[in-house]
Amino acid sequence: MPSELAELVEFLHHGNSQIRQIACENLLGFSISQPSLFKVHQLLPVRDLKLLVRDYTPIAKNALTILINLSGDEEVLKELAEDDAFLETLLSKVTVIISNSPPLPTGTAQQNKKEPHVNEITMLLTNLAKSDSFKRIINLTRSVPKDVSGSPKALDQLMDCFIKGQDGGINKAADSNYDYLAYVFADLSKYDEGRAYFLTRQEYDSVIPITKLTVFTEHRSHIRRKGVASTLKNIAFEVQAHPQLLAESGVNILPYLLLPVAGPEEFTDEESAAMLPDLQFLPPDKERDSDKDIIATHLETLLLLTTTREGRELMRAVNVYPIIRECHLHVDDEGTREGCDRLVQVLMRDEEGEANGGEDAALAKAKAEFEKGAADEDEQIVEVF
């Protein structure tokens, strides 16, 4: 059997497309159970698979799926993530209208269609973003895909795909929705350059990128909600940006963090009167986010935003406490309750005599706690079974 599998791997670069297709189909399951098969001859099978991403549709789909599964391996990840030409292949397929097949003979009509494997490509980009080398995409420029974006910046183009492509808005093929790009943004926001991008108004559309993402904290897609929640938390580590994040004329982040945490509970008129308008008189069928981890992430972001005295005073002024109190009472999860407790302790404490130096200590403590949890998230690789 091992010799037969080795022979099958050799067929990945066979000149006959039918043989390449059969090889991909039969090797797919082994990309999880026996990934070492693809690491022979200095990763030659991986290099073959990179080329097959541009092959006929059924071959390309299986090649992408195999690469998704293999990219959890550090050596394979390095091979994929550091390849500029391969990154451009993925970007051009995910951002523009292209042909899904190799060119037909001269004189043969060929109908261009939308890329049918958007979901697989964005899953692969999600895994590539685990590599530090992938952050070069933050400053990468390329040709403008006019059907999708008006910017030459690759990250702007991915943002536009994410915004316009939800629910098949750009690409109806195979229910393409670009949801997995939320995880790409979350990984990029861990870098200083990434946070700077999300907080800087972009020239091509005069919009601050993070304001495009906040609206997805209550989206029906769990992937979007989770990725955006992590992105917002990472952005909140930029303490100097807290005034911009909190201001109604800026990002106005508070409602987007509090709404997923809020449930259908009723508050007294006195409590409601001081709350943000979006949090007042919520309907009786209002539901909290169904994922306790996402709620915990929003609580961590809120805690980070209490690093400055101005942030704490704003949260007190808009009566955040009752919302957190009800979350503590109604979410049956120890981690969520601990997050509520930490936030309430900060909001309810006496500010008298507090020195500004305490803010640095609070941020350092928060970073230590959150980065410990983030280390586990970093190891999570998307796999397709």
PLM region descriptions:
Residues R201, K212, H219, I223, ...:
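Structured C-terminal portions of repeat-based eukaryotic scaffold domains
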Residues L27-I32, A63-G72, I121-S133, L181-D192, ...:
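Hydrophobic residues within the alpha-helices of tandem HEAT/HEAT-like
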Residues V94-K114, K153-S176, V261-D293:
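Acidic, Ser/Thr- and Gly/Pro-rich intrinsically disordered linkers and low-complexity segments
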Residues M1-R47, A60-K61, L70-T89, I97, ...:
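Elongated alpha-helical scaffolds that mediate protein-protein interactions in large eukaryotic proteins
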Residues F11-G15, L52-Y56, V94-I98, A109-N112, ...:
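Alpha-solenoid helical repeat architecture
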Residues E7-V9, P45-L52, T89-V94, A154-F162, ...:
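Buried hydrophobic core positions in alpha-solenoid tandem helical repeats
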Residues M1-L51, Y56, V251, P260-P264, ...:
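N-terminal "cap/leader" segments of large eukaryotic alpha-helical scaffolds
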